[in-house]
């Protein structure tokens, strides 16, 4: 999957660990959405 920035990672992608994974069809079972706003396409999810 494509890494993405969770809210807990910090405000920007620069210098922060991207702990989420981008899912286009929503978060799979056992995962949760870790970003309140965006990304524009898909959902940023983590286990």
From Swiss-Prot:
One GO biological process term: regulation of signal transduction
Superkingdom of origin organism: Eukaryota
Entry-linked InterPro entries: Anenome_toxin, Myo_ane_neurotoxin_sf
Localisation per UniProt entry: Secreted; Nematocyst
Cysteines joined through disulfide linkages: 4-44, 6-34, 27-45
Record key words, sorted: Cardiotoxin, Disulfide bond, Ion channel impairing toxin, Nematocyst, Neurotoxin, Secreted, Toxin, Voltage-gated sodium channel impairing toxin
Keyword hit for Iron-sulfur: no
GO cellular component: extracellular region; nematocyst
UniProt-listed Pfam families: Toxin_4 (PF00706)
Family the entry assigns: Belongs to the sea anemone sodium channel inhibitory toxin family. Type I subfamily.
Cited function: Binds specifically to voltage-gated sodium channels (Nav) (site 3), thereby delaying their inactivation during signal transduction. Has a heart stimulation effect on isolated rat atria that is higher than that of Hk7a, Hk8a and Hk16a.
Entry protein name: Delta-actitoxin-Aspp1a
Source organism of the structure: Anthopleura sp. (strain 'Zhanjiang')
Taxonomic lineage from the root: Eukaryota, Metazoa, Cnidaria, Anthozoa, Hexacorallia
């Amino acid at each position: 999957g494509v890494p993405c920035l969770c809210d807990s990672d910090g405000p920007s992608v620069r210098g922060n660990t991207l702990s989420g994974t981008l899912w286009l069809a929503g978060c799979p079972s056992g995962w949760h959405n870790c970003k309140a706003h965006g990304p524009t396409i898909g959902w940023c999810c983590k286990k």
